[in-house]
């Protein structure tokens, strides 16, 4: 615990950086997770699922 304190919490700049890095990592994980939930709930109703019915194949 002492090493964690000396590495992150003792210096305000390092602490703020750790908070921002943690928030960024959480945002990425949350966003990806919610996208997967949304895609699962709306499977077959999104443009990416029905595009092949309306767009002709490119040559």
UniProtKB/Swiss-Prot annotation:
<keyword id="KW-0999">Mitochondrion inner membrane</keyword>
<keyword id="KW-0249">Electron transport</keyword>
<dbReference type="GO" id="GO:0005743">
    <property type="term" value="C:mitochondrial inner membrane"/>
</dbReference>
<keyword id="KW-0496">Mitochondrion</keyword>
<comment type="function">
    <text>Component of the ubiquinol-cytochrome c oxidoreductase, a multisubunit transmembrane complex that is part of the mitochondrial electron transport chain which drives oxidative phosphorylation.</text>
</comment>
<feature type="transmembrane region" description="Helical">
    <location>
        <begin position="16"/>
        <end position="41"/>
    </location>
</feature>
<dbReference type="GO" id="GO:0045275">
    <property type="term" value="C:respiratory chain complex III"/>
</dbReference>
<keyword id="KW-0472">Membrane</keyword>
<dbReference type="InterPro" id="IPR008027">
    <property type="entry name" value="QCR9"/>
</dbReference>
<feature type="topological domain" description="Mitochondrial matrix">
    <location>
        <begin position="1"/>
        <end position="15"/>
    </location>
</feature>
<keyword id="KW-1133">Transmembrane helix</keyword>
<dbReference type="InterPro" id="IPR036656">
    <property type="entry name" value="QCR9_sf"/>
</dbReference>
<dbReference type="Pfam" id="PF05365">
    <property type="entry name" value="UCR_UQCRX_QCR9"/>
</dbReference>
<keyword id="KW-0812">Transmembrane</keyword>
<comment type="similarity">
    <text>Belongs to the UQCR10/QCR9 family.</text>
</comment>
<feature type="topological domain" description="Mitochondrial intermembrane">
    <location>
        <begin position="42"/>
        <end position="59"/>
    </location>
</feature>
<keyword id="KW-0813">Transport</keyword>
<keyword id="KW-0679">Respiratory chain</keyword>
<comment type="subunit">
    <text>Component of the ubiquinol-cytochrome c oxidoreductase (cytochrome b-c1 complex, complex III, CIII), a multisubunit enzyme composed of 10 subunits. The complex is composed of 3 respiratory subunits cytochrome b (cob), cytochrome c1 (cyt-1) and Rieske protein (fes-1), 2 core protein subunits pep and ucr-1, and 5 low-molecular weight protein subunits qcr6, qcr7, qcr8, qcr9 and probably NCU16844/qcr10.</text>
</comment>
<protein>
    <recommendedName>
        <fullName>Cytochrome b-c1 complex subunit 9, mitochondrial</fullName>
    </recommendedName>
</protein>
<dbReference type="GO" id="GO:0006122">
    <property type="term" value="P:mitochondrial electron transport, ubiquinol to cytochrome c"/>
</dbReference>
